[in-house]
Amino acid sequence: MNNSYAGPSSASADASATRRNSKRPKYSKFTQQELPACKPILTPQWVISVFTLIGLIFVPIGVASLFASNNVVEIVDRYDTECIPKNMTDNKIAYIQNQAINKTCIRKVRVPKDMDQPIYVYYQLDNFYQNHRRYVKSRNDAQLRDEKKANETSGCDPEKTAANGSPIVPCGLIAWSLFNDTYTFTRGNQSLTVNKTNISWKSDRDHKFGSNVFPKNFQNGTLVGGGSLDLNKSLSEQEDLIVWMRTAALPTFRKLYGKIEVDLKKNDIITVVLKNNYNTYSFSGKKKLVLSTTSWLGGKNDFLGIGYLTVGGLCFFLAAAFTVVYFVKPRNS
């Protein structure tokens, strides 16, 4: 008589196996790290070829970048130290804070090479930390964008309200410290007009500064900061403010003041009548006026070209070094 009963030990083993199988994850090549992979073998020929190719690409780019940078004509004139009366050179802060003193200063600059229009006019500030956390946060973007939120001044400390408690529009330290030096240019008897339209980012004008938001109580606080604003123009039209409020990442920066749309010839003498209003003396800052042309690469900047040439030259050197080693001491096969 056949007995088909397996007994309790067999049933227990089957149950244990079932439990183990139920906990096993679904098999896939991805989870088991069995995907096909490419493992290139770095032979001397490959390494030499790659370094040579990188050098062949980077060196021409570096040469073209340096050539473009050298074609940019740039005039830089530091005027903060030159535009102080001799009797006040030892007390610069008192000079700049005294509203009764005439701050007009006349500078003459010579054009070193022909400058084709448009010629961009910048002001450059040194040792001005616009990236300071408290400074960067001292603004209210909702207020700048929407007239219905003119009373919102959160985040604008310490320039939130005027002496009578009314909200300041635009509020905050960034707007309060608006750059307010001015420049006018003449060449001989010819006045050079500075075009100040479209000097800011279009996205800022269209989306960050409202066309129906107008200045209120600006520079009416107990301590006057920088420049003033036209009360009859909306914030989206006040491009000097828009340019200034796009804060710089580094303590030395340039901001666009305007464009001169006539050609300047070599050895032309440009007379600059400027108002030295902005206080950089209290923090040992520097002010410079910059006139510059541009190239397909932008303004004058040798760093990019030098960087490409350095990397390309290093790759050529490594390719040559590997070639010498490969032929002098070849690897045994």
Outline where the language-model segments fall.
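Soluble non-transmembrane domains of integral membrane proteins
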Residues: 101-242
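Juxtamembrane interface at the cytosolic side of transmembrane helices
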Residues: 297-333
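Membrane-proximal N-terminal segments immediately preceding the first transmembrane helix
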Residues: 17-42, 84-97, 283-294
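Extracellular beta-rich ligand/substrate-recognition surface
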Residues: 92-103, 245-252
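Extended, hydrophilic extramembrane loops/domains of integral membrane proteins
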Residues: 121, 257-291
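Exposed beta-sheet edge/beta-hairpin loop segments within beta-rich domains
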Residues: 109-113, 232-237, 241-268
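Internal alpha-helical transmembrane segments
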Residues: 31-71
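Alpha-helical transmembrane signal-anchor/signal-peptide segments
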Residues: 67-89
